[in-house]
């Protein structure tokens, strides 16, 4: 086990003492050592209400091989050895003597686990207080810090009773759980937008669900975590509308210029406002939906309000879904504008009674994963006031990069046949309300047909519809600070979405952080080896509470999880830069790779059907030596590595080839070859319900990325796809003459990948990708000019 920690601060001793007193500990350096140890260790069992109960708890802790903590305290000690203190500390942190560590040498385990410690014996009360302060900020076996663990057991439950008025509590630069999340005020409002996406002549009203600390009713104003979540009110069965992968790749007769595919913002409609008949300070509707994001729940107990809004076309709101269109961005912005006092909302949909977010400080962070993170990124690119930061996990920065690639229809990994129209149906939760649907069904079906037409599955080309869903175009407008989190094995929302957005905001005068993990499309807030919750606590305390805690400097710019060394996260200045830390090597495919042939015929669709494969089994087989697809691919290998190497950046392919057809699909996979136990792409559960989000509150599982039980022969590092009629970009077309050589350039997905010595790099070049592209029936023959082809690989040195 490794408990990496990036968010721990080390303030000077006076600040440490003041903070210890602020959380209710007896922390006077002038007290005797004996009295201080008794007071402090007794305080560490808040679940024990009497001295007798506390003494029993103390008797369960071993100081060394000879005595318990209760017996040791009874001797009124005047000092404590470093070893004895950390024997006690480890048990308080949830580790077991004899099982997890040796009482004769706790430091061996602490070093391996990356736990901090003082380097000397405790010979004074000041030493003790320093050790206790460090202990409170040390991570437990249960992922959270020790102070969080104490608070989860009731240590801070009476904090507000001792204050003249409700307030936030900060410790070590981070806000603490001194609010009872169980008592949160739950309410619903309807925010008036500027849009009419369902074409009924009225401004769409957008439902927003609010959970705010009860202390706001006593005058406390709080910042807001806002999650724009299209799934919040449920999803629909999309089996009937999911596309069957087409069997013919169209020959494109014409392309377009950049100007022709550039979308121009539409002029806002001049719509009448909903009538106003009064104002209220209390909502009329209870929020019946439960919060569905543990990250938000964690901060609700720390004095942040949490707001969810599903947006246009969802249950209890007006409008139609647009799958990432400007209307969905505007819907998220409308919620922020209400939270900052710049837009009206109503207590119900009909009476015209307005309500303000009077409890809000007007400081907002957007959070969430996938579609939720996508809308956070989209809102940030508007430059809306009040949005201080986004914490965007696996978000889409351009919808073309989600459903298309280089002139091809390319489904997100794991969702073959999905497209923008399918997702629109999936999230159109208005249809769950029959009384609502009967009034809009015909208009919705007409609207959906427009999405199906405009997404253009026939050519897969980039057009104005996709351009309107490219948020990177407006990245220069971003004013909010940005945290991006992404899985390096996320083939659903591929890593290019994060890295291209990261590059687009690189020169902006904002703070920005990037976290890259070895998972697929998953959260990392409950991954034990990373202190992600503390990192974001430090960040949000700075961003939303205005605390000068140095978060922008303390937190690394880039944190990357290693794919070989278990539970290892490394800090870097940037991704794929600066130049002094990176080098690129261009490898010729003929002289630097071994290949049995330079040609293949793509029989993948026939093989897929004959093998009764699935998308998942195909993805395994296409990168496995000697699989059923061996004749439908080109397999190129390099010699085994003599030393460890780390790829970091965007692999780039230059390829000269000829095909025997006027159109074709080319897919490329970069492979780590060699039998090994590699990390699973989904973190495994290590403690069911082990992460507590607040005192007597919700829990979630603690997870960890682990090597698989069985070795595998290969692992996908990166991949890319291209329609060979689009060698330059996704909108210009180049005619293919069968049998005549032509050249293409192809960027693969960004990666950070540690290759151990002894492994081999392999390059797999093939045609149709059964898991993601369409599945042509017609076979195509590919002839690769290896001597005039190369791949450029970026390395961190």
UniProtKB/Swiss-Prot annotation:
SUPFAM superfamilies on file: alpha/beta-Hydrolases, Galactose-binding domain-like, X-Prolyl dipeptidyl aminopeptidase PepX, N-terminal domain
Molecular function GO terms recorded: aminopeptidase activity; dipeptidyl-peptidase activity; serine-type peptidase activity
Class of enzymatic activity (EC top level): hydrolase
A Pfam family: Peptidase_S15
GO cellular component terms, semicolon-separated: cytoplasm
Single GO biological process annotation from the record: proteolysis
Presence of the UniProt keyword Protease in the record: yes
Gene3D superfamilies given in the database record: 1.10.246.70, alpha/beta hydrolase, Galactose-binding domain-like
Catalytic activity of the protein: Hydrolyzes Xaa-Pro-|- bonds to release unblocked, N-terminal dipeptides from substrates including Ala-Pro-|-p-nitroanilide and (sequentially) Tyr-Pro-|-Phe-Pro-|-Gly-Pro-|-Ile
Protease as UniProt keyword: yes
Subcellular locations according to the entry: Cytoplasm
Active site: 370 (charge relay system), 490 (charge relay system), 521 (charge relay system)
Enzyme Commission code(s) on record: 3.4.14.11
Primary location class: cytoplasm
Keywords in alphabetical order: Aminopeptidase, Cytoplasm, Hydrolase, Protease, Serine protease
Family note: Belongs to the peptidase S15 family.
NCBIfam families: PRK05371.1-2
Assembly mode: Homodimer.
Its job: Removes N-terminal dipeptides sequentially from polypeptides having unsubstituted N-termini provided that the penultimate residue is proline.
Protein name as it appears in the record: Xaa-Pro dipeptidyl-peptidase
Gene that specifies this protein: pepX
């Amino acid at each position: 086990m490794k408990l990496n920690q990036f968010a721990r601060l080390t303030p000077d001793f006076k600040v440490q003492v003041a903070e210890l007193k602020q959380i209710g500990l007896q922390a006077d350096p002038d007290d005797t050592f004996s009295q201080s140890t008794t007071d402090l260790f007794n305080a560490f069992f808040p679940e024990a209400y009497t001295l007798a109960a506390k003494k029993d708890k103390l008797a369960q802790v071993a100081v060394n091989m000879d005595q318990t903590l209760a017996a040791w305290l009874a001797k009124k000690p005047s000092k404590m050895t470093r070893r004895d203190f950390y024997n006690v500390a480890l048990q308080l942190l949830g580790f077991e003597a004899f099982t997890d560590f040796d009482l004769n040498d706790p430091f061996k385990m602490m070093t391996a686990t990356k736990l901090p410690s003082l380097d000397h014996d405790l010979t004074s009360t000041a030493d003790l207080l320093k050790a206790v302060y460090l202990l409170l900020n040390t991570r437990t076996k249960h992922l959270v810090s020790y102070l969080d663990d104490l608070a989860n057991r009731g240590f801070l439950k009476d904090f507000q009773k001792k204050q003249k008025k409700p307030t936030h509590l900060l410790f070590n630069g981070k806000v603490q759980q001194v609010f009872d999340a169980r008592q949160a005020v739950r309410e619903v409002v309807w925010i008036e937008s500027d849009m009419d996406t369902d074409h009924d002549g009225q401004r769409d009203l957008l439902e927003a669900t609010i959970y705010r600390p009860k202390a706001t009713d006593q005058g406390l104003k709080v910042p807001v975590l806002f999650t724009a979540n299209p799934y919040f009110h449920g999803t629909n069965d999309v089996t009937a509308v999911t596309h069957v992968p087409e069997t013919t790749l169209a020959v494109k007769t014409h392309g377009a210029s950049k100007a022709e595919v550039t979308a121009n913002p539409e002029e806002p409609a001049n719509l009448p406002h909903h009538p106003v008949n009064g104002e209220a300070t209390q909502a009329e509707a209870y929020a019946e939906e439960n919060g569905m994001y543990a990250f938000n729940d964690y901060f609700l107990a720390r004095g942040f309000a949490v707001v969810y809004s599903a947006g246009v076309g969802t249950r209890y709101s007006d409008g139609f879904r647009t799958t990432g269109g400007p209307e969905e961005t505007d819907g998220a912005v409308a919620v922020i504008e209400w939270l900052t006092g710049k837009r009206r909302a109503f207590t119900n949909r009909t009476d015209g009674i307005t309500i303000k977010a009077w409890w809000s400080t007007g400081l907002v962070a957007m959070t969430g994963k996938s579609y939720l993170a996508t809308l956070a990124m989209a809102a940030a690119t508007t430059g809306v006031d009040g949005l201080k930061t986004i914490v965007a996990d696996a978000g889409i920065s351009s919808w073309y990069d989600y459903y298309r690639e280089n002139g091809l229809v390319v489904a997100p990994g794991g969702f073959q046949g999905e497209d923008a129209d399918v997702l629109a149906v999936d999230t159109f939760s208005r249809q769950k309300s029959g009384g609502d649907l009967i009034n809009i069904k015909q208009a919705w079906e007409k609207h959906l047909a427009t999405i199906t037409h405009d997404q253009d599955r026939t050519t897969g080309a980039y057009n104005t519809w996709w351009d309107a869903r490219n948020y990177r175009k407006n990245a220069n407008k971003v004013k909010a600070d940005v945290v991006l989190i992404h899985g390096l094995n996320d083939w659903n929302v591929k890593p290019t979405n994060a890295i291209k957005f990261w590059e687009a905001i690189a020169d902006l005068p904002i703070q920005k952080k990037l976290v890259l993990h070895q998972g697929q499309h998953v959260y990392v807030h409950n991954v034990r080896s990373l202190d992600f919750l503390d990192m974001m606590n430090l960040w949000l305390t700075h961003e939303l509470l205005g605390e000068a805690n140095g978060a922008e400097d303390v937190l690394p710019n880039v944190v990357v999880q290693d794919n070989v060394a278990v539970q290892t996260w490394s800090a870097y200045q940037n991704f794929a830069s600066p130049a002094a830390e990176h080098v690129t090597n261009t490898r010729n495919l003929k002289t630097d790779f071994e290949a049995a042939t330079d040609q293949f015929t793509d029989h993948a669709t026939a093989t897929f059907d004959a093998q009764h494969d699935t998308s998942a089994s195909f993805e395994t087989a296409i990168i496995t030596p000697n699989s059923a697809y061996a004749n439908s691919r080109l397999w190129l290998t390099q010699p085994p590595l003599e030393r460890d190497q780390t790829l970091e950046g965007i692999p780039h392919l230059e390829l000269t080839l000829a095909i025997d057809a006027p159109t074709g699909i080319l897919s490329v996979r970069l492979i780590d070859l060699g039998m090994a136990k590699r990390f699973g792409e989904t973190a495994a559960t290590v403690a069911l319900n082990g992460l507590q989000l607040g005192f007597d509150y919700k829990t979630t599982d603690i997870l960890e990325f682990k090597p698989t039980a069985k070795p595998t022969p290969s692992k996908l590092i990166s991949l890319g796809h291209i329609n060979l009629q689009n060698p330059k970009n996704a909108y210009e077309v180049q005619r293919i003459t069968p049998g005549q050589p032509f050249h293409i350039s192809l960027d693969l997905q960004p990666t950070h990948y540690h290759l151990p010595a002894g492994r081999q790099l392999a390059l797999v070049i093939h045609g149709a990708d059964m898991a993601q592209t369409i599945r042509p029936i017609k076979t195509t023959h590919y002839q690769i000019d290896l001597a005039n082809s190369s791949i450029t690989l970026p390395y961190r040195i």
